[in-house]
């Protein structure tokens, strides 16, 4: 059985020339997401009006308003939209699915009203965020509702705080058991599978001609990661005397236990 948003949910204007009012979305995150990024989907499913009202408001953001914002504000908008619509996709299912991958067409087929258009989650990630902005840290911020995803923040991204928030996200992501492991004794550096899937996104800003190891994509990823580790680990990564491998990806729902 699939549940949908209450059709009586109000469609509110959430945006202005100054940016987006994230009050409703902040309330959702602070209430149902813990400090480790796990989500209480069962409770959210029972009290989803704020989430639905915010998501309905995404449809009212027009191109003129969106284009008037700073790049940081635009990135924050699209990241928040991706994450809030992912939450919707999960709680639309009754009973809750064990994994987002159990929801047919969740990324490619299910369309959501946003920016006076209809977009899938794949459209937001691959046709907007990854195309319009040179910001590979977005991969630490968009959360696909799986255990191996980066942690979901329990506050909204904002244009004003985006740079610091993205750095925090990277640090928390790499600190996870399947984010980064540097094993000097074994000569192995193991990183999230996300870096394998989207390694090319790091080349424009972090590509290098020497140092590190592996393919051009892996060198760029390792250069990026080196900005977030100790000086000792940075020197080890730059030396390149190790093998790169990737953690298996756990698609189990990032549900609070």
List the predicted regions and their residue ranges.
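Interaction/scaffold regions that mediate signaling and macromolecular assembly across diverse proteins
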Residues: 2-79, 83-257
């Amino acid at each position: 059985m699939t549940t949908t948003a209450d059709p009586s949910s109000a469609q509110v204007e959430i945006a202005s020339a100054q940016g987006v009012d994230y009050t409703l979305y902040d309330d959702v995150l602070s209430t149902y997401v813990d400090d480790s990024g796990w989500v209480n989907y069962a409770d959210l499913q029972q009290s989803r009006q704020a989430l639905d009202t915010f998501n309905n408001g995404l449809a009212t953001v027009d191109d003129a308003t969106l284009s008037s914002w700073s790049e940081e504000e635009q990135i924050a908008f699209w990241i928040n939209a991706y994450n809030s619509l992912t939450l919707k996709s999960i709680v639309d299912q009754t009973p809750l699915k064990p994994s987002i991958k159990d929801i047919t067409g969740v990324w490619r087929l299910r369309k959501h009203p946003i920016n006076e258009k209809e977009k899938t989650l794949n459209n937001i990630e691959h046709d907007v965020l990854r195309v319009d902005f040179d910001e590979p840290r977005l991969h630490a911020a968009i959360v696909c509702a799986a255990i191996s995803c980066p942690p979901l923040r329990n506050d909204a991204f904002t244009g004003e705080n985006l740079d610091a928030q993205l750095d925090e996200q990277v640090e928390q992501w790499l600190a996870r058991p399947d984010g980064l492991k540097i094993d000097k004794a074994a000569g192995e550096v193991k990183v999230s599978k996300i870096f394998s899937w989207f390694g090319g996104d790091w080349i424009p800003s972090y590509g290098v001609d020497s140092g590190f190891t592996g393919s051009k994509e892996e060198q760029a990823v390792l250069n990026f990661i080196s900005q977030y580790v100790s000086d000792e680990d940075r020197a080890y990564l730059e030396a390149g005397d190790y093998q790169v491998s990737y953690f298996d990806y756990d698609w189990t729902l990032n549900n609070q236990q």
